[in-house]
Protein backbone atom coordinates (compact mmCIF):
# COMPACT_ATOMS: atom_id res chain seq x y z
CA UNK A 1 0.00 0.00 0.00
CA UNK A 2 1.34 3.42 -0.98
CA UNK A 3 1.32 6.66 0.93
CA UNK A 4 -2.30 7.81 1.00
CA UNK A 5 -3.86 11.19 0.38
CA UNK A 6 -5.01 11.21 4.01
CA UNK A 7 -1.47 10.53 5.26
CA UNK A 8 -0.16 13.39 3.15
CA UNK A 9 -2.89 15.68 4.55
CA UNK A 10 -2.00 14.65 8.11
CA UNK A 11 1.68 15.47 7.54
CA UNK A 12 0.76 18.78 5.87
CA UNK A 13 -1.50 19.96 8.68
CA UNK A 14 0.90 19.05 11.48
CA UNK A 15 3.83 20.55 9.52
CA UNK A 16 1.92 23.85 9.58
CA UNK A 17 1.45 23.55 13.37
CA UNK A 18 5.19 22.89 13.80
CA UNK A 19 6.13 25.97 11.77
CA UNK A 20 3.87 28.25 13.82
CA UNK A 21 5.93 27.90 17.01
CA UNK A 22 9.72 28.30 16.95
CA UNK A 23 10.02 26.65 20.38
CA UNK A 24 9.40 23.28 18.71
CA UNK A 25 12.83 23.55 17.07
CA UNK A 26 14.45 23.86 20.50
CA UNK A 27 12.35 20.94 21.75
CA UNK A 28 13.48 18.80 18.79
CA UNK A 29 17.19 19.29 19.52
CA UNK A 30 16.67 18.99 23.28
CA UNK A 31 15.13 15.54 22.72
CA UNK A 32 17.96 14.52 20.37
CA UNK A 33 20.62 15.48 22.92
CA UNK A 34 18.73 13.83 25.77
CA UNK A 35 18.71 10.58 23.79
CA UNK A 36 22.21 10.94 22.31
CA UNK A 37 24.35 13.54 24.14
CA UNK A 38 27.38 12.74 21.98
CA UNK A 39 25.49 13.99 18.91
CA UNK A 40 25.95 17.57 20.12
CA UNK A 41 29.22 17.94 18.22
CA UNK A 42 27.52 17.05 14.95
CA UNK A 43 25.64 20.35 14.94
CA UNK A 44 27.74 23.50 14.54
CA UNK A 45 25.05 25.61 16.22
CA UNK A 46 25.08 23.41 19.37
CA UNK A 47 28.67 22.34 19.97
CA UNK A 48 29.80 25.54 21.72
CA UNK A 49 26.82 25.92 24.07
CA UNK A 50 26.08 24.20 27.36
CA UNK A 51 22.44 23.62 26.43
CA UNK A 52 20.13 23.95 23.47
CA UNK A 53 19.76 27.67 22.82
CA UNK A 54 17.44 29.08 20.21
CA UNK A 55 19.25 30.66 17.28
CA UNK A 56 18.57 31.41 13.62
CA UNK A 57 20.82 28.49 12.59
CA UNK A 58 18.99 26.07 14.90
CA UNK A 59 15.63 27.27 13.56
CA UNK A 60 16.79 26.95 9.96
CA UNK A 61 18.16 23.44 10.44
CA UNK A 62 15.06 22.19 12.27
CA UNK A 63 12.80 23.65 9.58
CA UNK A 64 14.99 22.01 6.94
CA UNK A 65 14.75 18.58 8.63
CA UNK A 66 10.99 18.76 9.15
CA UNK A 67 10.55 20.33 5.70
CA UNK A 68 12.42 17.47 4.06
CA UNK A 69 10.20 14.93 5.83
CA UNK A 70 7.17 16.93 4.71
CA UNK A 71 8.51 16.92 1.13
CA UNK A 72 9.10 13.18 1.43
CA UNK A 73 5.41 12.71 2.20
CA UNK A 74 4.54 14.60 -0.98
CA UNK A 75 7.01 12.52 -3.02
CA UNK A 76 5.74 9.25 -1.54
CA UNK A 77 2.18 10.18 -2.42
CA UNK A 78 3.11 11.28 -5.95
CA UNK A 79 5.62 8.62 -6.99
CA UNK A 80 5.96 6.06 -4.20
CA UNK A 81 9.61 6.90 -3.55
CA UNK A 82 11.78 9.65 -2.07
CA UNK A 83 14.58 11.22 -4.07
CA UNK A 84 16.97 13.53 -2.22
CA UNK A 85 17.30 16.78 -4.17
CA UNK A 86 20.53 17.92 -2.50
CA UNK A 87 23.39 15.89 -3.93
CA UNK A 88 25.67 16.86 -1.02
CA UNK A 89 23.35 15.50 1.68
CA UNK A 90 24.93 12.04 1.75
CA UNK A 91 28.45 13.48 1.92
CA UNK A 92 27.51 15.86 4.74
CA UNK A 93 26.08 13.00 6.79
CA UNK A 94 29.24 10.93 6.20
CA UNK A 95 31.43 13.89 7.18
CA UNK A 96 29.47 14.38 10.42
CA UNK A 97 29.83 10.68 11.30
CA UNK A 98 26.14 9.83 11.07
CA UNK A 99 25.42 6.10 11.50
CA UNK A 100 22.17 4.08 11.59
CA UNK A 101 21.40 4.62 15.31
CA UNK A 102 21.41 8.40 14.72
CA UNK A 103 18.55 8.02 12.25
CA UNK A 104 16.53 6.24 14.95
CA UNK A 105 17.18 9.03 17.47
CA UNK A 106 16.16 11.71 14.99
CA UNK A 107 12.98 9.79 14.11
CA UNK A 108 12.05 9.48 17.78
CA UNK A 109 12.74 13.18 18.40
CA UNK A 110 10.78 14.14 15.29
CA UNK A 111 7.76 12.09 16.37
CA UNK A 112 7.86 13.43 19.94
CA UNK A 113 8.08 17.00 18.62
CA UNK A 114 5.19 16.52 16.18
CA UNK A 115 3.16 14.95 19.00
CA UNK A 116 3.75 18.07 21.09
CA UNK A 117 2.98 20.41 18.17
CA UNK A 118 -0.20 18.52 17.25
CA UNK A 119 -1.66 18.50 20.74
CA UNK A 120 -5.14 16.97 20.77
CA UNK A 121 -4.91 16.25 17.02
CA UNK A 122 -2.21 13.63 17.71
CA UNK A 123 -3.15 10.08 16.74
CA UNK A 124 -1.53 6.79 15.80
CA UNK A 125 -2.50 7.54 12.21
CA UNK A 126 -0.65 10.87 12.34
CA UNK A 127 2.36 9.20 13.93
CA UNK A 128 2.42 6.51 11.24
CA UNK A 129 2.22 9.10 8.45
CA UNK A 130 5.26 10.98 9.79
CA UNK A 131 7.11 7.74 10.49
CA UNK A 132 6.61 6.44 6.94
CA UNK A 133 7.64 9.80 5.45
CA UNK A 134 10.73 9.94 7.68
CA UNK A 135 11.71 6.37 6.83
CA UNK A 136 11.47 7.25 3.14
CA UNK A 137 13.78 10.21 3.64
CA UNK A 138 16.21 8.27 5.85
CA UNK A 139 16.44 5.52 3.22
CA UNK A 140 17.18 8.08 0.51
CA UNK A 141 19.90 9.73 2.64
CA UNK A 142 21.47 6.35 3.48
CA UNK A 143 21.46 5.50 -0.22
CA UNK A 144 23.22 8.82 -0.94
CA UNK A 145 25.80 7.95 1.75
CA UNK A 146 26.86 4.77 -0.08
Curated annotation (Swiss-Prot):
Chain positions recorded as heme b binding sites: 44, 64, 93, 96
GO biological process: nodulation; response to abscisic acid
Organism superkingdom: Eukaryota
Disulfide feature: none
Post-translation changes: Nitrated in effective nodules and particularly in hypoxic conditions; this mechanism may play a protective role in the symbiosis by buffering toxic peroxynitrite NO(2)(-). Nitration level decrease during nodule senescence.
Principal place of residence: cytoplasm
Inducing stimuli: Strongly reduced levels in boron-deficient nodules. Inhibited by abscisic acid (ABA) in parallel with lower nitrogen fixation in nodules.
Tissues where the protein occurs: Root nodules.
Localization in the cell: Cytoplasm, Cytosol; Nucleus
Entry similarity comment: Belongs to the plant globin family.
Official protein name in the record: Leghemoglobin Lb120-1
Amino acid sequence: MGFTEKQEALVNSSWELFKQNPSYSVLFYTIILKKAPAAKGMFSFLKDSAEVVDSPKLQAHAEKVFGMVHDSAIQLRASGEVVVGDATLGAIHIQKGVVDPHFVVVKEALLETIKEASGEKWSEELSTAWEVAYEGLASAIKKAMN
